[in-house]
């Protein structure tokens, strides 16, 4: 009986030790997130060929062709809820095959971003800070037997390197040589508030619902001491030509106004935005985005 109790105690000790070890053990694989301006299933296939256990997620909807600004904004937005160790691959690469660098950026909160250094990484650099940047060493971090291919680095370099990093095949240090902790920045000016008038640009883009958002953040907007129901007079211009002009209420959310009505609101990224409740404001009014698209907003007193 004494031996039985001793064996039981030993088994309990081993099980407890294993449980503690399992509790502290890091996951073998991290998630891999792929965004691109084309269908990314081929890149997902490359990732799965590195490890069948790898969790791969494709961002939908696709980024508009060659739209580096949208890639930067989307990448920064989607990264905000993912845990430390997650690897993101972004392939919006109009300069593929040229001298632009292929890099992996590590943020200060432990996320990894694999991309051409063409402005795509400016959003995550601003949002999360840069811990380190490494240039991908293609002599070791390139899909085998693709050295001859120069127009599909998303498949042959970025998804392959990202998958190897996420699966633990390579460490961040094995990506390649360390670079200066900086990336190419997109030129996005900050919104302003002077003499009770907001000025900004449709810098963030137009989302899939046709809502448009500006480089006027919540903190800047609150300088006007807005209250829900306040009416704002809005003008949207393209190269100084007025494209849309009118007034709308500042609202908490879409349902605060009738279906088909316009509203001004703060979106989930904390940016001043315009929408039509259950409609597409951008499509209905021919609104685009970029540095040439400007907005002015003034509260009706």
Regions found by a protein language model. Give the residues of each.
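Boundary of Sec targeting at the N-terminus
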Residues: 22-23
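A conserved acidic, glycine/proline-rich C-terminal tail/linker
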Residues: 213-286
């Amino acid at each position: 009986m004494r031996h039985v109790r001793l064996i039981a105690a030993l088994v309990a000790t081993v099980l407890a030790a294993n449980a503690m070890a399992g509790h502290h053990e890091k996951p073998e694989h991290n998630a891999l997130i792929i965004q691109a301006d084309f269908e990314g299933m081929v890149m997902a296939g490359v990732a799965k060929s590195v490890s069948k256990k790898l969790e791969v997620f494709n961002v939908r909807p696709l980024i508009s062709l060659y739209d580096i600004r949208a890639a930067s904004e989307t990448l920064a937005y989607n990264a905000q809820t993912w845990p430390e160790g997650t690897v993101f691959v972004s392939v919006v690469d109009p300069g593929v095959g040229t001298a632009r660098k292929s890099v992996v950026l590590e943020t200060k909160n432990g996320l990894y971003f694999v991309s051409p250094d063409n402005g795509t990484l400016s959003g995550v650099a601003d949002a999360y800070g840069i811990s380190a940047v490494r240039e991908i060493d293609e002599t070791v971090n390139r899909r085998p037997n693709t050295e001859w291919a120069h127009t599909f680095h998303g498949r042959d370099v970025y998804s392959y390197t990202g998958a190897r990093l996420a699966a633990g095949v390579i460490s961040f240090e094995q990506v390649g040589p360390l670079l200066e902790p900086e990336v190419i920045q997109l030129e996005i000016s900050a919104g302003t508030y002077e003499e009770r008038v907001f000025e900004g640009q449709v810098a963030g883009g137009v989302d899939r619902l046709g809502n448009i958002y500006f480089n006027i953040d919540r903190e800047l907007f609150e300088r006007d001491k807005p209250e829900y129901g306040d009416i704002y007079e809005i003008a949207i211009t393209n190269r100084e030509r007025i494209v849309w002009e009118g007034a709308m209420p500042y609202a908490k959310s879409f349902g605060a106004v009738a279906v088909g009505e316009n509203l001004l609101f703060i979106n989930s990224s904390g940016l001043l935005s315009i929408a039509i409740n259950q409609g597409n404001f951008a499509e209905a009014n021919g609104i685009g985005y970029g540095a040439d698209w400007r907005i002015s907003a003034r509260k009706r007193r």
